[in-house]
C-alpha cells in the first residue's frame, strides 16, 4: 500500500522564507480584525496541553519540547485531502467541534493564522513553511493542489519515490536550504513504498527586550533534576522589571519575558513536588487567567542558558487521541487523489530551541543599562529546578513552542 509520510519540523533558529510566500502576505488581515484567530488560538492551546499530557505519560521525567502550532497546521493541511471519517477524526482529534466550527471555517482559520505568523515584523523573524513532495506516479486532484498552495502557502514538488535515496536527498536538501544548514539529513529511513511526504516547519529568531549581560552569567550553577540528581548549568542573572505572579491555586510562579517585538516567553516554576498538579491544570483558560493577573515589578531573576531538542514519532499518540483511520488500510484520502490505498505511515516531529543571554540566537551586540544594586525588596525567582516553558506570538496569542525542562544539560 502506498504510504503518506508527514514530517513536522520546528526550529528556534533563523530560517530562509520560502519563495512561494513572497508577495502573498502583504494583504494579510490584521489579527485584531479577525475573531477566528482568537477562537483558533484557544482550541490549539487546549490541543497543545492535551498532547503535552500524553507526552508526560509516554516519556515521564524527561525534557519535552514541541510546537503546538506546527503540528495542528500540518494535520489540518493533511485533512484537505481526507474525506468521510478520516477527515472527521483528524479535525476532531485536533479539538474542533465540527457542529460549532464547520470545516471551511477551520481551514480559513489556519489560512489566517499562517498569514499572520508570516506577516513581516521588525526585529522578529518568524516563518511557517510547508512543502509537499508528491510521487510522480500519483495523480493529485487540482483542487487539493490549489488548496494547499492558497490556504497553507505550500511548495509542491513532483518527486520520483522509486529512487528512494534520490527522493530522500531531495527532501533533505530542501529542508537544509530552508533552515540555512541548521538541519542536515532530516530523513534517514524513507520507506520504499512511500509516495507522498509533507514537511511543515516553523522557524523563529528573536532578541530579548531586555537582554542579559553575559558577564553576569554564572557558569557552574546547580540545577535540581530530581531528589537525588543535580547538574551544573550556566545561569543567567538579571535585575529587571518583569510581568510575574504567584498562582496560589496552582502552586506555581509565572514569569513573562518579552522578546523585542510580538513574542513572549512564559516561564512556569511549580513549587517542589507540584509539577504534576500544574501540568494537569494547564489549559487555554489558565493562560487567559495568567494574562489577566500578571503584574509588572522588579525581579531578581536567574534563568539557565540552555538548548533543547526533541524528535517524536506521533503516530501512536495520535491514534490514542482518536486519529485512527488515517493510519489504517481503509483510510480515505480521495480528496487528494482518486488513486486507491493511500494511508499515513508516520507523523514525525522534530523540535530544536536555544535560549541565551540575547534571545534565541546570537544577535548584534547590545548595551546593558545599570541595574539597581539593592535586592532586599525585590522577589528572587530562580529557575533552578524543573520548569515549563511557553513561547507565544502576541498578536494571535498562539503557542509557538511548549515544553518542560527537566535537565537543561541534555540537548
Swiss-Prot record:
Domain of life: Eukaryota
CDD domains on file: serpinA7_TBG
SMART domains xrefs: SERPIN
Signal peptide, first to last residue: 1-15
Tissue-specificity statement: Expressed by the liver and secreted in plasma.
One function term, GO molecular function aspect: serine-type endopeptidase inhibitor activity
Keyword terms, alphabetized: Glycoprotein, Secreted, Signal
Localization terms from the record: Secreted
Ranges in a coiled coil: none
UniProt-annotated binding residues for thyroxine: 291, 394
Gene Ontology CC entries for this record: extracellular space
SUPFAM superfamilies in the record: Serpins (SSF56574)
Residues annotated as glycosylated: 34, 97, 163, 251
InterPro entries registered for this protein in UniProt: Serpin_CS, Serpin_dom, Serpin_fam, Serpin_sf, Serpin_sf_1, Serpin_sf_2
Function of the protein: Major thyroid hormone transport protein in serum.
Family assignment from sequence similarity: Belongs to the serpin family.
Protein name: Thyroxine-binding globulin
Lineage of the species this protein comes from: Eukaryota, Metazoa, Chordata, Craniata, Vertebrata
Amino acid at each position: 500500500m502506498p504510504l503518506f509520510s508527514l514530517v513536522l519540523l520546528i526550529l528556534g533558529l533563523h530560517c530562509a522564507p520560502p519563495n512561494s510566500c513572497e508577495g502573498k502576505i502583504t494583504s494579510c488581515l490584521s489579527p485584531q480584525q479577525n475573531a477566528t484567530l482568537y477562537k483558533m488560538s484557544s482550541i490549539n492551546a487546549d490541543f497543545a496541553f492535551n498532547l503535552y499530557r500524553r507526552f508526560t505519560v509516554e516519556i515521564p521525567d524527561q525534557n519535552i519540547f514541541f510546537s503546538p502550532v506546527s503540528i495542528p497546521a500540518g494535520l489540518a493541511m493533511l485533512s484537505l485531502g481526507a474525506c468521510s471519517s478520516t477527515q472527521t477524526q483528524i479535525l476532531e482529534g485536533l479539538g474542533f467541534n465540527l457542529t460549532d466550527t464547520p470545516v471551511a471555517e477551520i481551514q480559513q482559520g489556519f489560512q489566517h493564522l499562517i498569514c499572520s505568523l508570516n506577516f513581516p515584523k521588525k526585529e522578529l523573524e518568524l516563518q511557517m513553511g510547508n512543502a509537499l513532495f508528491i510521487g510522480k506516479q500519483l495523480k493529485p486532484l487540482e483542487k487539493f493542489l490549489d488548496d494547499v498552495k492558497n490556504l497553507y502557502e505550500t511548495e509542491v514538488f513532483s518527486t520520483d519515490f522509486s529512487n528512494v535515496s534520490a527522493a530522500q536527498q531531495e527532501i533533505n536538501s530542501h529542508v537544509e536550504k530552508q533552515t540555512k544548514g541548521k538541519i542536515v539529513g532530516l530523513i534517514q529511513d524513507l520507506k520504499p513504498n512511500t509516495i507522498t511526504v509533507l514537511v511543515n516547519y516553523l522557524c523563529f529568531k528573536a532578541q530579548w527586550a531586555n537582554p542579559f549581560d553575559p558577564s553576569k552569567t554564572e557558569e557552574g550553577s546547580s540545577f535540581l533534576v530530581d531528589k537525588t540528581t543535580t547538574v551544573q548549568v550556566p545561569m543567567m542573572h538579571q535585575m529587571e522589571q518583569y510581568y510575574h505572579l504567584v498562582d496560589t491555586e496552582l502552586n506555581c510562579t509565572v514569569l513573562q519575558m518579552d522578546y523585542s517585538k510580538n513574542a513572549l516567553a512564559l516561564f512556569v516554576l511549580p513549587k517542589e513536588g507540584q509539577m504534576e498538579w500544574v501540568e494537569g491544570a494547564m489549559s487555554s483558560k489558565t493562560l487567559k487567567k495568567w494574562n489577566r493577573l500578571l503584574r509588572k515589578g522588579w525581579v531578581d531573576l536567574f534563568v539557565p542558558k540552555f538548548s533543547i531538542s526533541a524528535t517524536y514519532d506521533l503516530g501512536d499518540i495520535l491514534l490514542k487521541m482518536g486519529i485512527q483511520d488515517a493510519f489504517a488500510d481503509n483510510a480515505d484520502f480521495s480528496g487528494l487523489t482518486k488513486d486507491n490505498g493511500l494511508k499515513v505511515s508516520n507523523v514525525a516531529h522534530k523540535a530544536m530551541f536555544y535560549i541565551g543571554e540575547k534571545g534565541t540566537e546570537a544577535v548584534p551586540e547590545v548595551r546593558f543599562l545599570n541595574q539597581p544594586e539593592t535586592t532586599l525588596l525585590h522577589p528572587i525567582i530562580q529557575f533552578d529546578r524543573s520548569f515549563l516553558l511557553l513561547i507565544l506570538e502576541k498578536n494571535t496569542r498562539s503557542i509557538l513552542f511548549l515544553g518542560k525542562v527537566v535537565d537543561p544539560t541534555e540537548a
